């Protein structure tokens, strides 16, 4: 196997309303987006941000910050703000098949309206169970790879194939034991808010995480997904990743990409996935 390509993907996981009201969470969303925009402006943030598979985050933000529309459109056009494919993350068993299709159509349409190219990552990692037609529905939009977590066996196996009721297949990345929060908890220690940041410890934790993912992933492409429940970008840990990318350990190359770029690399090695 040639050098392992580590794909760092920056995201969040956003419930519009959960243990706080919609407006309380929107207040936090505005902060999150403002901090991202500032990071791109001052050069500390050097890659794309994935909007949790949804476009509604951007809609909610622009309702509160309409003056930011031109900046959002510029970021979308440049590929730094990656939206969709969903309008809003669905529950597959509470809505009809028609609703799922229209949800995807609306999300992709909005992403284009804001100047972006809608994500082709079938992002359904936090849904409590899946229906057998999802690969078929995704394929109708040219989406041939996705990301899951809940309800999937073999937590130490990252890549598998999902076959729909009609025989349509898609390649699936399965998040680890803690799901999309793996990196956030094991490297950023976001579940320990009082823990002081330590760059050296951050680098040690990062490489332990990467090497664990390498063991669980058959392809050269490895995913480091930085996104947890309502979490913002963390400039300190991001700086550690950038520093390590300049002189990575032997056998690894580190970059900041998107879910689309990661899945495209995985698809190229699809023959190794069963």
Can you name each region flagged by the protein language model?
Residues 1-274:
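Catalytic-domain carbohydrate-binding cleft regions of carbohydrate-active enzymes
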């Amino acid at each position: 196997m040639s050098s392992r390509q580590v794909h760092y993907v920056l995201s969040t996981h956003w419930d519009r309303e959960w243990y706080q009201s919609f407006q309380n969470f929107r207040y936090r969303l505005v902060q999150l987006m403002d901090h991202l925009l500032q990071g791109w402006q001052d050069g500390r943030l050097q890659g794309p941000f994935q909007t949790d598979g949804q476009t509604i985050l951007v809609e909610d933000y622009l309702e509160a910050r309409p003056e930011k529309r031109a900046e959002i459109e510029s970021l979308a056009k440049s590929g730094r703000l990656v939206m969709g494919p969903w309008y809003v993350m669905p529950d597959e068993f509470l809505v009809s098949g028609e609703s799922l299709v229209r949800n995807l159509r609306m999300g992709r349409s909005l992403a284009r309206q804001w100047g972006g190219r809608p994500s082709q990552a079938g992002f359904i990692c936090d849904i409590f169970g899946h229906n057998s037609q999802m690969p078929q529905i995704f394929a109708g939009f040219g989406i041939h790879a996705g990301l899951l977590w809940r309800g999937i066996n073999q937590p130490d196996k990252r890549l598998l194939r999902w076959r729909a009721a009609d025989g349509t297949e898609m390649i699936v990345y399965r998040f680890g034991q803690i799901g999309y929060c793996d990196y956030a908890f094991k490297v950023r220690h976001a579940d320990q808010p009082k823990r002081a940041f330590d760059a050296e410890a951050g680098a040690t934790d990062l490489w332990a995480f990467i090497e664990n993912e390498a063991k669980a992933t058959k392809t050269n492409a490895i995913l480091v997904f930085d996104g947890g429940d309502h979490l913002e970008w963390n400039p300190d840990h991001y700086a550690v990743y950038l520093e390590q990318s300049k002189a990575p350990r032997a056998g690894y190359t580190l970059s900041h990409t998107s879910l689309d770029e990661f899945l495209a690399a995985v698809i190229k090695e699809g023959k190794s996935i069963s």
